[in-house]
Structures are given as C-alpha cells and as structure tokens.
C-alpha cells in the first residue's frame, strides 16, 4: 500500500500543522527553571504555564471541530493560527509570570485548531488501515518535535534567552499560514457541510456521549497522552535540578522517548493489519501498564538511578506509539458525518485529562521522580482497565482501507 503524491503532500502538511502544538511546549521546556528564576516565581507557579496551555488546547478544540463541520476545514485553521501568533508575541513580551500564563492560554486556544482539524481531515479522506497508515505517518512528523524542539530551544535560550523561543514560534506560525494557503486543499466541500445549528451541535454531542466505545477509546488514548504531559511538566526539573544535567543534555535524553515512540508507531499499520487494531491496542496497553508499575515500584523503593528512569520511560513511551494513534482511528471510524465534532470532543477530553494530571502532580512535586512516576502509573493502570472494558471482545477481521 503506497501513498499518492497528493496524499504524501497532505500527510506532510497535516503533520507539520499537528506538530505546532507539541513544538510550542517542547522548545521552552529546557527554560522552565530559568523562567522561574527570571520571573521570580516558584516551580509550581511556573508549571501553570503548561497547565493553562493544555487547558486552552483541550477546551478550544470543541469550538474548532464543529465549526469545521459547518464552514469547512480551512477557515478555522486561519483563525487558530492568528490567535497563536498573537499569543506567541505576548509571551515573548511577558514582564511577569501572570502575563506569561495568560498569553500561554491564548497560545493554546489558537493551536487547538491544529489538533482537532487535521484528524477530521484524515477522516474526510480515509478510514480503516489507510487512515491508520496516514495517522501513523502524521504521528511520525509530530514525534520528531520532541527530538528537535528541545535542542532548538536550548540553542535559542543559550544564545538569546528564553524569550527568543516565542519569537521563533511566531515565525513558524507565519510559515504555517503560507502552507495552509498554498498547499492544503479543502476536504469538506459545501454539499457535505452541516447546517450552522446549535441544536445540531447539541444532538451531535449527545450521540458521542452515549457512545461508550467512543468515550472509552478516547480516554484510553487520553490517559496515554496524560502520562506524556506529566513527563513534559516534570522532566526538566527532575533531569536538570535533581540529576544535574545541562539543558543540552536534558534535550538529548528527552529526545530518546521520541525515538521509542517513533520506532513503535512505524509498526502500527503492519501490526493492525495482522492482528486487528483492537488486539494491537490491548497488547500495547498491557505492556504500558507493566513498565509503568515497575518504574513506580522501583522509585517508591528508593531507587534513584538516572539510567533506570531513562530506560523504563523509554519502554513506557514506546508503548504509547501503538496506543495513541490507533485509539483515535477506532474512536472516529463510526462518526464520519461528525468527524470534526468527534475529533474536537475527543481532543478536549484528552487535553483535559492531561491538564488535570499535571495540576495533580504539581501539588505533590518534590523535584524527585516519585510524583511523576506515580502519576504515570495511575494513567497506565486506568488506560489498561478502560481498554479492556471497551475492547475486550472478539474483533472482526481487519478492515480494508477505503
């Protein structure tokens, strides 16, 4: 199975759009300790810049998705990117932590469009294994972000200070606007658009809320993402402040998790075609819980080894490469007419889960790995229970691509 030239172009462009949100997180992670010092605030308050970003990132997807079902996919992308540019400029000029938190919220509100709408576009174009293949390819592009972004951020921070990160994000958003205008086609033609109706949106929400399979799959993937968000919020303080790494060394070890995620995601389509996506997800979530519980047990027993932490986190995030993409494909496959709304609602649930876990972890943060590993284990066990409650039955033969 190979992509056409147009499909390859769309995959690359959608992947770049989808990477904007993670890139806006990962580039400034190495600067969190220095931001706390520069703006004279605490670690917990500094982590609020992540929490508010994730909150807006999740909640605002619920706006972009339904609107894209009604007026097309491209107009909401223009609106979101404009908001992101405004928020990035505000962050670059932030005189205090309150200002930075507020404009990070605006940033998140803008970049929410780049999460909800690309997944809806994939559903416009494909279902089944072809959708899994395209989603995995996009996840590959997204996953390069954790390898490049911290290194890029470290270089900018060392050379020009942490504010330069937000200047670079502003430039990247303008490039994305150009790609949107010149390269991305409209995949929601007028004849397929839903009427602009609050009642229709309410009925669509009702349909999704009553679909236990949709909710279970979305939250399974969301709990996987939540463990990633907890790592994002805690890792720079643990690696730099606790273990004494430099920002550049932190970026390297941070990128190892992306390597595991990328490597496993490349096998998602092959494994789904052989075993079925449900069996793939159940197997991956079982190993996810297994490695997370081992990590928690060792940390709780007082094992303060950087090598052990890095190795087991690599295993945990390798499992997520086989969970996050396939669960979203399975969740959306029966909701084609509501693809934008379903993608947005699913994204909102996932981001809200991640934001809540960050807030919960920050309450117990000690600059050691224990609160982080406990939160990751909680996410993993919960995902395991949800996955087996949702998918613990015989799956039909693997679906052919459309």
How does the language model describe each region?
Residues 329-367, 376:
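A late C-terminal transmembrane helix in Major Facilitator Superfamily
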Residues 2-3, 187-218:
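Juxtamembrane intracellular "pre-TM" segments in multi-pass secondary transporters
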């Amino acid at each position: 199975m190979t992509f056409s030239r147009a499909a390859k172009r769309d995959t690359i462009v959608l992947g770049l759009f989808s990477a904007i949100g993670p890139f806006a997180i990962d580039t400034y992670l190495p600067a969190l300790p220095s931001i706390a010092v520069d703006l004279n605030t605490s670690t917990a308050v500094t982590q609020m810049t992540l929490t508010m970003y994730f909150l807006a990132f999740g909640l605002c997807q619920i706006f972009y998705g339904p609107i894209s079902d009604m007026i097309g996919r491209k107009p909401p992308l223009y609106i979101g990117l404009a908001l992101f540019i405004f928020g990035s400029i505000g962050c670059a000029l932030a005189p205090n932590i309150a200002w930075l938190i507020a404009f990070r919220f605006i940033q998140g509100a803008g970049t929410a469009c780049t999460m909800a709408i690309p997944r809806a576009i994939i559903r416009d174009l494909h279902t089944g294994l072809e959708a899994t293949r395209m989603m995995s390819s996009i996840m590959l592009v997204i996953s390069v972000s954790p390898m490049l972004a911290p290194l890029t951020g470290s270089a900018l921070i060392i050379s020009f200070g942490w504010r330069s990160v937000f200047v670079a994000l502003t430039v990247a958003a303008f490039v994305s606007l150009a790609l949107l205008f010149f390269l991305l086609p409209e995949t929601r033609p007028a004849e397929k658009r839903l009427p602009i109706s609050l009642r229709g949106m309410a009925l669509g929400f009702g349909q999704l809320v009553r679909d236990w399979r949709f909710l279970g799959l979305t939250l399974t993937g969301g709990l996987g993402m939540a463990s990633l968000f907890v790592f994002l919020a805690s890792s720079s303080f643990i690696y730099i402040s606790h273990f004494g790494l430099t920002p550049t060394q932190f970026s390297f070890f941070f990128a190892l998790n992306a390597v595991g995620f990328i490597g496993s995601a490349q096998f998602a389509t092959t494994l789904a075609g052989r075993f079925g996506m449900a069996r793939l997800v159940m197997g991956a979530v079982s190993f996810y819980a297994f490695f997370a519980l081992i990590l928690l047990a060792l940390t709780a027993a007082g094992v303060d080894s950087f090598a052990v932490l890095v190795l087991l986190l690599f295993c945990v995030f390798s499992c997520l490469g086989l969970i996050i993409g396939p669960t979203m494909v399975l969740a959306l496959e029966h909701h084609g007419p509501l693809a934008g709304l379903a993608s947005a609602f699913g994204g909102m649930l996932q981001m809200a889960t991640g934001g809540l876990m960050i807030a919960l972890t920050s309450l117990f943060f000690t600059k050691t790995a224990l609160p982080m590993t406990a939160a990751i284990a909680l996410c993993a066990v919960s995902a395991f229970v949800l996955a087996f409650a949702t998918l613990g039955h015989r799956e039909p033969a693997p679906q052919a691509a459309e």
